[in-house]
Amino acid sequence: MQRRIMGIETEFGVTCTFHGHRRLSPDEVARYLFRRVVSWGRSSNVFLRNGARLYLDVGSHPEYATAECDSLTQLVTHDRAGERVLEDLLIDAEQRLADEGIGGDIYLFKNNTDSAGNSYGCHENYLIVRAGEFSRISDVLLPFLVTRQLICGAGKVLQTPKAATFCLSQRAEHIWEGVSSATTRSRPIINTRDEPHADAEKYRRLHVIVGDSNMSESTTMLKVGSASLVLEMIEAGVAFRDFSLDNPIRAIREVSHDLTGRRPVRLAGGRQASALDIQREYYARAVEYLQTREPNTQIEQVVDLWGRQLDAVESQDFAKVDTEIDWVIKRKLFQRYQDRYNMELSDPKISQLDLAYHDIKRGRGVFDLLQRKGLAARITTDEEIEAAVNTPPQTTRAKLRGEFISAAQEAGRDFTVDWVHLKLNDQAQRTVLCKDPFRSVDERVKRLIASM
């Protein structure tokens, strides 16, 4: 499948600092955030005009699920648009607090762990053909996902009883299973719950919940692009060396704690391989595969960055990728800070900096400041992100959903939507079922809109 439907779901961390005597719990802060949403959507679980879903998840975490995208730059742009949507809610909520005499600054973090050790996720969704053997996909994909922290981890300072240590991944410490149907209780790497949000006879949806939330656009593109390419190669019958892991959960932690990528990881049957060895195998197959695949500039950019990052890890010289990979950008920032102020990695100020890197408020968040200074590369533009806040992807089913929502809201009509249904809540209860996520034009939807 060379054209693939993809999406990213991001849960955001919430905290608030108060200036007066009045204090609010995280639950109350989250409700303030969603008050504007509830006022027009009558719910804290809504679909937006850009086709995305916005809702309050368990544990007061706002969650933004992008609309269906069929290209990498489109997905990166819509992922960033989610940050803007949440930032707008943040500004509105702070104003509401002020109007009620509650002085406070709300913070939304696009990260994966809070100071209490709770974890929340960034989930990737990939449409795959039903005909394939799912166990083969998960067998080949699992070693890739366990070791891809080397190329797309967000980086984290982990405080251990002995010392503070810099790790590749925020999520690695919180994953407890390889493949499972649960998402919260056991936190697997691949979630097998079969909800295709499409024609179930043709497709299923691969739900990957092991990834870090990335601030860097180029890292997001590499994370999703490399996984999508590996899926495409599996579907095309490309043969990979067997890197079945003896214990994926132990391996994911070992890989996260080794910035050199050289630490041996135990494979099934007693063999060993390093994270770098494993990533090199997938990368080599990708380079070969591109020779036979029809040209695609975005995929070529992904493979180029993949190779440069593996070279950087191998040589431990990160100069050629230090604006493109989250954990590399973050580590360089910490090192400069430590050198300037002569401080240890365990200093609380470094932990504050770690958190501030993921603050999504422009002008305050550290990543935003790095980006403005040219220290973090761009894939998209501010104008494209602003457009994506209100406009759905034009090449997928999201276009139908977005146009239906816009028309219904402007006509003042009551409606219900989900990923596959568009329904007018009138006497006729007219409903259109959109089972094909690739389809952006549908006469039935046009008629439904025209009838408003």
Swiss-Prot record:
Keywords: ATP-binding, Ligase, Magnesium, Metal-binding, Nucleotide-binding, Ubl conjugation pathway. Pathway: Protein degradation; proteasomal Pup-dependent pathway; Protein modification; protein pupylation. The keyword Secreted does not apply. GO terms for molecular function: ATP binding; ligase activity, forming carbon-nitrogen bonds; magnesium ion binding; ubiquitin-like protein transferase activity. GO terms for biological process: modification-dependent protein catabolic process; proteasomal protein catabolic process; protein pupylation. The active site is at residue 57. ATP binds at residues 53, 66, 419. The keyword Membrane does not apply. Pfam families: Pup_ligase (PF03136). It catalyses: ATP + [prokaryotic ubiquitin-like protein]-L-glutamate + [protein]-L-lysine = ADP + phosphate + N(6)-([prokaryotic ubiquitin-like protein]-gamma-L-glutamyl)-[protein]-L-lysine. Mg(2+) binds at residues 9, 55, 63. Its EC number is 6.3.1.19. Coiled coil: none annotated. Catalyzes the covalent attachment of the prokaryotic ubiquitin-like protein modifier Pup to the proteasomal substrate proteins, thereby targeting them for proteasomal degradation. This tagging system is termed pupylation. The ligation reaction involves the side-chain carboxylate of the C-terminal glutamate of Pup and the side-chain amino group of a substrate lysine. HAMAP family: Pup_ligase (MF_02111). Belongs to the Pup ligase/Pup deamidase family. Pup-conjugating enzyme subfamily. The reaction mechanism probably proceeds via the activation of Pup by phosphorylation of its C-terminal glutamate, which is then subject to nucleophilic attack by the substrate lysine, resulting in an isopeptide bond and the release of phosphate as a good leaving group. This is Pup--protein ligase. It comes from Mycolicibacterium vanbaalenii (strain DSM 7251 / JCM 13017 / BCRC 16820 / KCTC 9966 / NRRL B-24157 / PYR-1). The lineage of its organism: Bacteria, Bacillati, Actinomycetota, Actinomycetes, Mycobacteriales.
